Amino acid sequence: MTTPHHGPLRVGIGGPVGSGKTALMEGLCKALRGRFDLCAITNDIYTKEDARLLTVAGALPEERIMGVETGGCPHTAIREDASINLAAVAEMRRRFPSLDLILIESGGDNLAATFSPELADLTLYVIDVAGGEKIPRKGGPGITRSDLLVINKTDLAPLVGADLAVMEADTQRMRGGRPYVFTSLRRGDGVEAVARFVIEAGGL
């Protein structure tokens, strides 16, 4: 976690395309909306599809969900030049002055994507079992340095021949004691554990 700042806790959610970032956003919104004043910001390159999906799912009222069209590399919009997302955060804070929490979903990217500390106080990184049991040992800052690693789609392990015990051992080795959680977000499994981490690690 980066040095605390004045204002709502900003949680960055990153990970490759299809890993389950939007499903995690939806689950966290539904788990936390009754306890905290929150909003969600999503990033897509050319559309606002993830924002639309959250709205349709009823994750939050429509006015509390903002879609950002990055128009280019999704990594740049959360790291090297986060200005478009910082502007979105500022706008949400203007609309809702009492915010406790802002969830920020990056566009799908590779294992090297990380959030700028200017943008996110706490980072969650989502990978999925369908990518194969080798994913944790490939490393990259999302896997090794995120505040919480979320290993999603555990229900698919038997179908893709992935050994969860191997994935867990590799995760422990690559993360050096940093926390991780196995989830099956489609089933709702593990959402509460992630929500609890956000509350405790974020000091909510």
UniProtKB/Swiss-Prot annotation:
Cell location: Cytoplasm
Keyword check for Transmembrane: no
Keyword Transcription: no
UniProt protein name: Urease accessory protein UreG
GO molecular function annotation: GTP binding; GTPase activity; nickel cation binding
GO cellular component entries: cytoplasm
Transmembrane annotation, as ranges: none
Single GO BP term: urea catabolic process
HAMAP family: UreG
Alphabetized InterPro entries for the sequence: CobW/HypB/UreG_nucleotide-bd (IPR003495), P-loop_NTPase (IPR027417), UreG (IPR004400)
Subunit structure: Homodimer. UreD, UreF and UreG form a complex that acts as a GTP-hydrolysis-dependent molecular chaperone, activating the urease apoprotein by helping to assemble the nickel containing metallocenter of UreC. The UreE protein probably delivers the nickel.
Annotated residues for binding of GTP: G15, P16, V17, G18, S19, G20, K21, T22
Main location: cytoplasm
Signal peptide limits: none
Keyword vocabulary terms for this entry: Chaperone, Cytoplasm, GTP-binding, Nickel insertion, Nucleotide-binding
Job of this protein: Facilitates the functional incorporation of the urease nickel metallocenter. This process requires GTP hydrolysis, probably effectuated by UreG.
Similarity comment: family membership: Belongs to the SIMIBI class G3E GTPase family. UreG subfamily.
Organism: Methylobacterium sp. (strain 4-46)
